[in-house]
């Protein structure tokens, strides 16, 4: 049985007399020890999905689902106090911006030890010892000294390592990483990615990694879920998705990035025409049809998820070996 099971997850946000359907019926599972990458452009609902899983949505947002369970625990039926017991304990999160994720008024040691004393019956001394061990595990030297420092005294890369250590304090089953390297420079990004991947393998963590960077996904993902306009339009093992993308949006994304060994110097990259549709009000049919070169009238109807062997695509044209629907500009069709 999957460690995390999500079925028909929706997030709706009232806007006066209208409603923004930000997340529209997500289905996915995460196995123990698996790295699932959720990829999509800004505004597709990735971050709201992570907040919905943590039950940390804005007050006006409404979360519904047919099923939302963690290791057999029904998270939909949990009270706020019960969810507080799960957060940081069984389910932890690494946020995008480390500076705003840490309280500037408290030392690193205070913030790390609080996680353990909140969820475990341990003394502050033991909690600080555990905090020092976790700082060392995430590659921070002079851990005892760092515990006495405050967030503003650390670099961005060190602050993000502290956030990772905080997420690991109670040895959670699932970690959600919401674009954890976006605010860091390229060199530090690579170090943090390697750290997350190494810890995931060492500790057997299930990780949901949220990003817009397909190059990053290719390096770290076990499975990939592609989001567009609040829906997962394709999900597959990472190698399968990159070698045999079936949804036109996925193909458009892959055509827009240079691929080592395939993209020639000076070769123009592809682009996806049109704009993302508004998600205000009732939505029907394929959300990508206004940008898809092969859209037909039937695409205006609700498109079911078409499941192949370990490969789901929400498209009427999904078929192994189908011709690409997007071509790089300047390339022959």
Annotate each PLM feature:
Residues 149-154, 158:
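Conserved ABC ATPase signature
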Residues 237-332:
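Charged, flexible cofactor/metal-binding loops and thiol motifs
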